[in-house]
Amino acid sequence: MESHAKTGTQQMVPAAPHGLALRSSAIVARGLRDLARDSNWLIKKIFTVRCSQLAISASGQVCAVAMMAPLGTERICLFDIELSAPIAMLAIPPDQPGGAPGLPAAFVYSPTARLLVAAWGAWPPELQVFDLHGKTFLGSFGGFSNLPEALAWSPSGKYLASATLGGREARLRLWEAADSRFGMPFTGNPVAELPAPSKLDDLLGAQTPETESVDDGTVAGFGRAAFSPDDGTLAAVVRVEGEWADDALALFDVPTLRRQHAFQTQGRITDVSWAFDGRQVIFCAAGQAYRLLADTMQPDPLPLGAEFCVCHPHLPLCLCYSSWLKNSAKGRLFLIDLERMAVFDEYPAEGVVDLRWSLDGSKAYAVTSDGLAYIYEPPLV
């Protein structure tokens, strides 16, 4: 599907008639491949172009900034993991031919994967909203001076958070969804907006014991963010300037963005995810996975290194990815039992840039920037 503007409205038009025949053949192919599988993992190529940034939906779609050879420009494309095929190119009016390579982008799907909010350096500096089921471009909101470093949508769909870098211009902003089933979910000004502290001590000093030292580094802004399962708390990374700086993880009330708790980690925080019961936060810092228990607010290392993590929607499981293993140059995907704190499944993988569980938790996806998908389909989950 490709996006076009018609008489003042925006519409995504099918690029090719895949139809039910393709879907039926895909179902048959999946049944045949499962007969020959000897593990819980399936590897497949879903696109051949090089993608600089991407995000996976809970329905098994991938939104990516894809290089369009031989034009030498990039476009925002949608791919279907099960079909291993492109399904749309997204555009806003006027339909632009593409953007220069390397422009920043940020994407987030709604919990049901019906809506997509996107920002891209080739588009006007606003958050753009697409209805993927209705095949329409809904509009834009949330103008910004710095393109978001991360976007997060709450599990109920009620809130959307935008986190930006930029020092004094950095902001953590929160919008509340309007009462509209099929229209624009977010409009106007955010319900809460929090500027980044200039120094990390401004965030941590009041709650840090005198016996502990605080790295009084300059704050670059906000990074990755994730909502708790009940929408009541937002965990957000506070980025510190410097290649070897130690970031902080902060918990904020929703919708006020009042700080609950914050602590400094060791190294750069690359991902954060809430366990299904809201009692612990899993995060990755300096290549190590940690968990933060709600009752102690003390981070404990998990028995594995990881740069990315995503928790199961209703089981005490977490999927993690590490690009480097001790005594090996290769990376690995891990499934960890958060109750026993033990790895119970793993698979070699390289170049993974995003992870996602399906909406019902029956499978998990991991995708690389060159289009390789690792699909976890256990028989009992």
Model-derived features: positions:
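WD40-repeat beta-propeller superdomains and closely related acidic/aromatic-rich repeat-like regions
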Residues: 2-381
